[in-house]
Amino acid sequence: DVYKRQGTNPEQLFGIGYSACFIGAMQLAGAKLGIPVPREVAVDAEVSLGKTDGGATYALGVNLHISLPGLPAEQQRQLVETAHQTCPYSGAIRGNIDVEFSIA
């Protein structure tokens, strides 16, 4: 059965790459905005694979769970919005994959 295979699947690999890239984009955004990014910054990408409305094709969805401990909510929002505009992964999938953010 294809679902019982061991190892990493493509969705997990995409999530790992997106998470790492988004952390880098937040660090660049922090430097640009003058907002210090905490050392404990974390991004966990939850990538889902599902059928489209018609059921004929598959599509990805992403929820980035972002932890920026110690920063005020407004600074967290600014970092995430700016990073989303500059992150290469965000740019590559813009308009094709829905991305949601959960900021803690």
Enumerate the language-model features and the residues they cover.
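Short, small-residue-biased leader/transition segments that mark boundaries at the very start
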Residues: 2-3
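Short, polar/acidic, helix-capping and beta-turn segments at strand->helix junctions
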Residues: 6-20, 24-104
